[in-house]
């Protein structure tokens, strides 16, 4: 999996940062997939500065209905139609997302020439496509807001081909059945159980993408043990009370959560427009003083998961 940050500013855009949007490139050999998390104003323009085609976009996850996470959605949906894209698209989001999209399209006389499904979610598992599952967790914000935990299913362990050959199993289609954990019967009547020749499963990757939030009970469960946690760091330590009063988090709170949850890497984003490049580096240093494995997302920064 690969994360591409299209917008990293909180509330309003700046000269160097657009408002929130994150691409997740799933990079699976047998299944293409491009997911978008939040869609602030100007997201489709940001997308033009990447190598990704909107036609590959098949799922959009909206954390909440504040404009800096949402106002780019109608334009992206319409441009997708005007480009002749016919691939289906599914939008997941809190209550009200359906009304917002349908109203924007209706009032502007717009439509989509592709199947568009809108799923209004609550807390819990919202998707399992056979390769990975997505679970929504409620966060602490003035509007209904969710964070998303994306977990790949474990992959089968490697097949011990050498041991199978030694047991008289010819390479070919039988290996595929054994790789799937099935039991086969050889011509001499022997039964071979694939599970006996498989290494331990390879754990799938896990990723937590937070929407806007102050400290909350669900945060630890959302982030527990993930390889990468994406979390807002809207304000620095000295402005923590102000951040919390508006449903946001400070650098200290983001980094402390990462440490307590045992995550592999913390990526901070959604930084206040009050911070210039020097100020953003200060935010990064504050986080690293608590959780050293912290990175700062800038627009168009790419991270592997």
Curated annotation (Swiss-Prot):
Pfam families: Lactamase_B_2
PANTHER family assigned: ZINC PHOSPHODIESTERASE ELAC PROTEIN 1
CDD domains listed in its UniProt record: RNaseZ_ZiPD-like_MBL-fold
Cofactor(s) this protein requires: Zn(2+)
Listed name of the protein: Ribonuclease BN
Subunit-level organization: Homodimer.
UniProt remark on cofactor binding: Binds 2 Zn(2+) ions.
């Amino acid at each position: 999996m690969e994360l591409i940050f299209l917008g990293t500013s909180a509330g309003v855009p700046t000269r160097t940062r657009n408002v929130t949007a994150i691409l997740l490139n799933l990079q699976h050999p047998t299944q293409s997939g491009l997911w978008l998390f939040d869609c602030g104003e100007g997201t489709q323009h940001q997308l033009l500065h990447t190598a990704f085609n909107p036609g590959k976009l098949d799922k959009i996850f909206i954390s909440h209905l504040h404009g800096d996470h949402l106002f780019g959605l109608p334009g992206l949906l319409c441009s997708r139609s005007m480009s002749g894209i016919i691939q289906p698209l599914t939008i997941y989001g809190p209550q009200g997302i359906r009304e917002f999209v349908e109203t924007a399209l209706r009032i502007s006389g717009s439509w989509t020439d592709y199947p568009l499904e809108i799923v209004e979610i609550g807390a819990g598992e919202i998707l399992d496509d056979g390769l990975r599952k997505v679970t929504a967790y409620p966060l602490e914000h003035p509007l209904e807001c969710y964070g998303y935990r994306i977990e790949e299913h474990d992959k089968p362990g490697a097949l011990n081909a050498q041991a199978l050959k030694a047991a008289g199993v010819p390479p070919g289609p039988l290996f595929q059945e054994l790789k799937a954990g099935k039991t086969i019967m050889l011509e001499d009547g022997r039964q071979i159980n694939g599970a006996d020749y498989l290494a331990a499963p390879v754990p799938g990757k896990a990723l937590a993408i937070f929407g806007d939030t102050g400290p909350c009970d669900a945060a630890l469960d959302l982030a527990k043990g993930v390889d990468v946690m994406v979390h807002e760091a809207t304000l620095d330590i000295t402005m923590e009370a102000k951040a919390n009063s508006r449903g946001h988090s400070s650098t200290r709170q983001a980094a402390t959560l990462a440490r307590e949850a045992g995550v592999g890497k913390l990526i901070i984003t959604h930084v206040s427009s009050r911070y210039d490049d020097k100020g953003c580096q200060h935010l990064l240093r504050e986080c690293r003083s608590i959780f050293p494995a912290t990175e700062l997302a800038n627009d168009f920064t790419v991270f592997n998961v």
